[in-house]
A protein has these predicted regions:
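Aromatic (often tryptophan-rich) hydrophobic motifs at membrane interfaces
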Residues: 49-52, 60, 68-70, 81, ...
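Active-site/acyl-donor-binding loops of N-acyltransferases
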Residues: 47, 65, 119, 123-148, ...
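Short secondary-structure capping/junction motifs at helix and strand boundaries
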Residues: 94-95, 105-117
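A conserved beta-strand-loop-helix scaffold within acyl/acetyltransferase catalytic domains
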Residues: 2-54, 61-71, 117-251
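N-terminal cap/recognition module
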Residues: 76-83
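Short intrinsically disordered coil segments
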Residues: 78, 151-160, 314-322
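Short, high-confidence coil segments that cap the C-terminus of an alpha-helix
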Residues: 43-45, 107-111, 269-271
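Active-site phosphate/ATP/adenylate-binding loop shared across adenylate-forming ligases
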Residues: 86
Length: 348
């Protein structure tokens, strides 16, 4: 027999031990993501676990309720990242967790959205959700050390990595001590891209919650930050959820040094895999990650109204481009204030 219940703070050790034991478990499944969401954006969380009569965890499903003012709510697994979804080695347990999530979404009058890094047809069968797969993660296998990795690169890539170093740029790894410099780069770059920026408090909460698993990397030109990113370590994989570079330093390619620093760190931590994060096939970030040898791995997002197709709606894409165009022209101070107020309700 098994039972399903909502996990509490006291369940973090059990939850995390289970996540770390599962091949599909990643940093976003950890309890740290729940803590960061609650601490910074104050969203309600529903972390569901299935356990045996003896208290053994059989499966988990992390969920966050996004309730924007005047708009419909979304119960999502998980927001602000690439994937979440059910973790369980047992098909029946997975089905029970999905049924529970579907009933919960109905009781909350919320749209259910579940994100996976592998196909999960049971989501469509149990919850009646459509699927889209227009985004991919870019993954790179890592050798035993960074010297071997360097030797595997083509000469052109090695030259691109050396370029910022020849221009005097330097890479530094830290934590909260580099948060201000990270956020300086991040907020300016998000405005350039036409996207509302996450609150500084969100990034700080991620660093707080993930502790030693999270690190900040910054590339400097003199005393000025030119590129910056966050890296998370979970099991044998290093993941980069956010990275940015300032356009005025583009000639020196600081992002090349940033990612090389992250790759060295991942190798030093004993990681065998590197997740460059989400991209759209064929776009600029996809090609940037591809040059490192990364291969695409499709993401599978399930939700009401989603087509079983990787093709986004044309009109929706055009509207988004218009909004991005307008946002990028607003004064930096305006988007710095408005961005976090909007971004907390955008689960992407």
């Amino acid at each position: 027999m098994s039972r399903i219940r909502i996990a509490g703070t006291q369940d973090q050790p059990l939850w995390d031990d289970f996540v770390l034991s599962q091949g599909q478990g990643g940093p976003y499944h950890l309890f740290a993501w729940k803590r960061a969401v609650e601490q910074s954006y104050h969203h309600e969380t529903r972390y569901i676990l299935s356990e045996s009569d003896q208290g053994t965890v059989l499966g988990v499903l992390p969920l966050v309720l996004i309730k924007p003012p005047l708009l419909s709510s979304t119960l999502v697994s998980l927001p602000f990242c690439d994937y979440g979804g059910v973790l369980s080695p047992e098909r029946e347990v997975s089905r029970e967790l999905l049924e529970h999530a579907s009933a919960m979404a109905a009781s909350l009058n919320a749209r259910l959205e579940l994100r996976y890094r592998e196909p999960a047809p049971e989501v469509s069968h149990v919850c009646g959700l459509g699927m889209t797969s227009q985004k991919v993660r870019m993954l790179l296998d890592l050798p035993g050390d960074s010297d071997q990795l360097w030797g595997s690169f083509k000469s052109k890539l090695r030259s691109q990595i050396r370029r910022p170093q020849k221009d005097g740029l330097t890479f530094t790894m830290g934590s909260h001590d580099l948060l201000d410099d990270f956020y300086t780069v991040f907020r300016v770059n998000m405005r350039r891209l036409g996207s509302p920026v996450h609150a500084r408090a969100w990034i700080e909460s991620v660093l707080d919650a993930f502790s030693e698993r999270a690190r900040v990397g910054v590339v400097y030109s003199g005393d000025n930050p030119a590129a910056a990113g966050i890296i998370l370590i979970c099991r044998d994989t290093a993941t980069v959820p956010w990275a940015s570079a300032l356009s005025e330093y583009a000639r020196s390619s600081p992002n090349m040094l940033l990612y090389w620093g992250f790759l060295q760190h991942a190798c030093a931590c004993g990681c065998s895999g590197f997740d460059f994060g989400r991209s759209t096939p064929g776009e600029g970030t996809y090609r940037f990650k591809e040059q490192w040898g990364a291969r695409p791995s499709p993401l599978y997002w399930y939700g009401k109204g989603l087509p079983d197709s990787g093709v986004p709606a044309k009109n929706g894409g055009n509207l988004r481009k218009r909004i991005e165009s307008v946002w990028s022209t607003l004064p930096q101070g305006v988007v710095d204030h408005l961005g976090p107020l909007v971004r907390k309700y955008i689960p992407l």
